[in-house]
Amino acid sequence: MFRGILDSVPDIDTIHIGPTAYASKVLDTDGNITATLVTAGSNRERVSYDQLPQDLVNAFVAIEDERFWQHSGIDLKSILRAVRGVVSDDDSAGGGSTITQQLIKNNVFGGGLHEGKFQRYVRKFQEQYLALEIENQPGLSKEEIKKSILTEYLNTINLGANTLGVKVAARRYFNKEVSELTLSECTVIASITKNPTALNPITHPEHNAERRAQVLKNMLEQGYIDLVENLLAVTRIEGGQVN
């Protein structure tokens, strides 16, 4: 059975792990943008890794995949924790998918929609296989691969109300460029991706605030921020910033 599952895995040389749908810009004869054309699933603008504030990168890693910089595509500790959560019916245990696996799920397997239970298990196994393949490509350093994965992930994710990717989210929620986001604003955006509808900071600010508290707690525990930065971010969040 496992041989058949592996035989049906997409070839790593033919897949594209990044998003393909982006908003289109209309320019005048002087090269100025006069309009932005957006269709369903394309309200996205590309951002490079160098344009991402470090707090945003750290916030997503802290809440989504704390061992991202260390693992090689899959995280056995997270998988075991997730299994224990399923067995004990503990929703707070979290999922077992790494950021790499989430990216593959979204851009290679179409988000895993309309799957039966068996198909879901097959897809999960194939995600893990591809994640290992992608993170262990020859000719690239571990850091280069990790930065590329994070860039594609942060350009891909659904951040509520047809807001795709962090660049559009920064404008949507804070009316600023992604590179200008503060720590507290970064945690607002990082909090959305788990459930873009229920955690939308405009329509469900109280739910987003609860998730943001967890993001900040994780960042503090993982050494990305100190206690003073944590307290300042909480204060700014409570003051209200979302447009």
Please provide the spans of the model-predicted regions.
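N-terminal hydrophobic targeting segments that direct proteins to the cell envelope
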Residues: M1-T29, G239-N243
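Peptidoglycan glycan-strand catalytic modules in the bacterial/periplasmic cell-wall system
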Residues: T20-A23, L27-D226
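Non-catalytic structural connector segments
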Residues: D226-N243
